[in-house]
């Protein structure tokens, strides 16, 4: 009887594995009505979280982000886009406008979430967490945060570090 109880407790412990703090948030995908739990969808993957904007000098990074996503998603990599109007008012459109722009201009297929605030002092809980862990809050559009398969925030990258950066690519490859 005792071994049976131990096995049951072990199975229950395995099923209640905690969600990593960096993914323990829920957000609504663009134009969706129901939020998704990031942990349920992306735990165990290498995640690149990016704050985006459609009218920014860095907006062409969408192309590189999509390319990176397409090349590496089969190996457990995902890009998560979070549109924000925080910097320069460069994401003024509705969610429908954002989705149409991303799909028609850049063919974006990586997950894009609700328009949100990412700026220090106003950031949504995910970006507040990422800034607290890395010591770096977004200072402009297209800041990037890399999270490993265990949910540890590995590094923050500024807007200047593009998706085709050898440094970023090497770090992602090392985590896959």
What do these predicted ranges mean?
Residues 25-46, 67-72:
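A short beta-strand-turn-helix
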Residues 1-4:
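Positively charged n-region of N-terminal signal peptides that target proteins for export
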Residues 51-55:
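Amphipathic alpha-helical repeat scaffolds
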Residues 8-17:
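Hydrophobic h-region of N-terminal signal peptides that target proteins for export
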Residues 125-176:
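Thiol-/selenol-based redox modules, centered on thioredoxin-like
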Residues 43-47, 73-78, 106-111, 141, ...:
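Loop/turn elements at helix/coil->beta-strand transitions in domains of secreted/extracellular proteins
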Residues 18-25:
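Cleaved targeting-peptide boundary
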Residues 58-123:
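Structural microenvironment flanking redox-active thiols in thiol-disulfide oxidoreductases
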